[in-house]
């Protein structure tokens, strides 16, 4: 892809309350962005950002702090899937969630979604509203593609000032990126998730499973697999005896010998992705539902 995506949490600019409302974002820039010739000189001409939704609507639960993301790519997937680990803004809630987003849903928002503009009339707590006016051509924030080149816009330096001024004034999208299934893949009580990696595994019977490895702020690792239309935690491992936060989590690229590497302030731990030797009978192995293991 010719685009770069990055994730962060920021204070809401759309609304203003007594307490600061935090919003999880995904932003996008183009790799070949050279800035503008006059407007946005030596600055991004393609910067756009949108809200990431991770909520349980029927329970009015909002997970608005993003802690980590992982992009799952696989030949068995039609497109990359972005997994994000979220917690609520209020620390006393004691919940964590994992939401997944198709890359096409992200691109739909940036390439076809509505923009926002600063509110011209004071409307209680609302500071930004949907922009319903005319959108310049080429589309603001879009990367230089064949359509733009056909109009003689070869680089961002060629883009008209009207397009550049628009993206400078309207970097925020009105449309939000919604998760797969419109709800979290996993919600866990009494835990704060910090990092995530995801693997895609074909079991001995040919069934493909998504396996999530999620670390906690107490030095533990949860392993969850997809079956029966849901994610289920099948294993918990204590990685660090001092119950310290896991700050980095990596999955080795070698398919033959899969290992996880977890880092904290005190050190690094190497762990296998599965402990198959703990299942001493066929019944125990099947009951564990671990796609890495077979009897």
From Swiss-Prot:
Task: Cite the entry's keywords alphabetically.
Answer: Cell membrane, Developmental protein, Differentiation, Disulfide bond, Glycoprotein, Membrane, Neurogenesis
> What Pfam families has UniProt attached to this entry?
Sema (PF01403)
Q: Fetch the InterPro entries from UniProt.
A: Semap_dom (IPR001627), Semap_dom_sf (IPR036352), Semaphorin (IPR027231), WD40/YVTN_repeat-like_dom_sf (IPR015943)
**Residues in Sema domain copies:** 1-273
Which terms does the UniProt entry file under GO BP? axon guidance; negative chemotaxis; neural crest cell migration; positive regulation of cell migration; positive regulation of inhibitory synapse assembly; semaphorin-plexin signaling pathway
What SMART domains does this protein map onto?
A: Sema
How the protein sits in the membrane? Single-pass type I membrane protein
Tell me if Glycoprotein is a UniProt keyword of this record.
Answer: yes
Q: What does this protein do?
A: Cell surface receptor for PLXNB1 that plays an important role in cell-cell signaling. Regulates GABAergic synapse development. Promotes the development of inhibitory synapses in a PLXNB1-dependent manner. Modulates the complexity and arborization of developing neurites in hippocampal neurons by activating PLXNB1 and interaction with PLXNB1 mediates activation of RHOA.
Assembly and partners? Homodimer. Interacts with PLXNB1.
Family listed: Belongs to the semaphorin family.
Protein name per its UniProtKB record: Semaphorin-4D
What organism is listed for this UniProt entry?
Answer: Gallus gallus
Q: What is the gene name?
A: SEMA4D
